Amino acid sequence: MAKKIIGMFLGFVLVTVLGVGAYAYTIYQQSTQTLAKTYKQIGEETKVIEATEPLTILLMGVDTGNVERTDPWAGNSDSMILVTVNPKTKKVVMMSLERDILTQIQQPDGSVREAKLNAAYADGGAELAISTIQKMMNIHIDRYVMVNMHGLQRMVDAVGGITVNNTLGFPISIQDQEPFNTISIGVGEQTLNGDEALVYSRMRYQDPEGDYGRQKRQR
């Protein structure tokens, strides 16, 4: 599922770039018409700069933004996926981080406490979550993308839904934890809207693999 979300995110970036690009092109045309009278164009060779080093992006899903969670609490990063893009091998590798891993979290005041990995975001936002993961795994994270539950719903709806394959053999729902939520995802290939995609990515208690199964659905 994260692959679809990455695609959505890149799509939003592309739309923004195209909009800015169209405006910039208009200004460029006006400028070149004026400058053409004052200088002579010289030959230039266009060079394409290609990335050579891997790029690591942290995707974080934060458990805020739901209709039942409107308090000012920052939330936990209950979903964390490392995405590494390697231009040399031309491969993209995705790895989920277990949210319940016990680790050392250095607090903003300099003290250190042992807590679950997902609590780092609640303690100090994206900056502390990133630094905690970097220290724990001895890696460097270049960029991050953070989305809450409402953000996920809006992204999915904005692209007209996403198609998933429910291979669990039974409908997916979270009504046992949230009785008001009556959404159920049928077995097999399904096209989901934002509300349904949120349920699909959150359910874990009914999954035989628990949180590991949920991580697979998120990826």
Functional labels for PLM-detected ranges:
Residues A2-F12, T16-R219:
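Non-catalytic, solvent-exposed segments at the cell envelope interface
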